[in-house]
């Protein structure tokens, strides 16, 4: 009897997470993108994380395996990296956030990913973190 091989999807819709204002100093918002009860699980892992900080406070965005960026107030960052399975936003300021913070995740096949898969002669699914 052959085993069943489950493959994650190559592309996904954009999933949006709104972090309300008032995240206390040192407070953390964490989103696990592989929760079975959530529709994001069938698309995980993701390869694009965009965070739009509408607050005037500085936050730290953690993603992947120990990677992070600091994001000043009223600014945005787009992170493109394979294997994003969760992310956290930490208020690294001394005061609570005074505006919302919006995070978007998506899985998409970029030209770079397609070219790398061709050059390395490996399936795009494997390169993007699928099994």
Regions found by a protein language model. Give the residues of each.
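Extended, low-complexity segments enriched in Ser/Thr/Gly and acidic residues that occur primarily
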Residues: 1-21, 46, 83-90, 99-131
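Short, surface-exposed beta-strand/strand-loop-strand elements in extracellular ectodomains
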Residues: 45-48, 52-70, 96-106
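Hydrophobic loop/turn residues within beta-sheet-rich immunoglobulin-like superfamily modules
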Residues: 54, 81-82, 92
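Short, solvent-exposed S/T- and G/P-enriched segments that are highly enriched in secreted/extracellular
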Residues: 12-19, 23-39, 64-80
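Solvent-exposed, low-complexity, repeat-rich "mucin-like" stalks and linkers
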Residues: 31-53
């Amino acid at each position: 009897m052959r085993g069943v091989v489950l493959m994650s999807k190559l592309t996904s819709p954009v999933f949006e997470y709104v972090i309300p204002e008032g995240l206390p100093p040192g407070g953390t918002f964490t989103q696990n993108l592989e929760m079975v009860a959530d529709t994001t699980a069938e698309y995980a892992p993701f390869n694009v994380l965009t965070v739009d900080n509408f607050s005037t406070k500085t936050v730290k965005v953690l993603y992947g395996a120990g990677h992070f960026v600091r994001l000043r107030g009223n600014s945005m960052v787009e992170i493109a990296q394979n294997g994003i399975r969760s992310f956290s936003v930490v208020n690294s300021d001394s005061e609570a956030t005074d505006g919302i913070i919006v995070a978007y995740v998506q899985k998409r096949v970029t030209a770079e990913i397609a070219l790398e898969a061709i050059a390395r002669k490996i399936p795009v699914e494997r390169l993007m973190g699928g099994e």
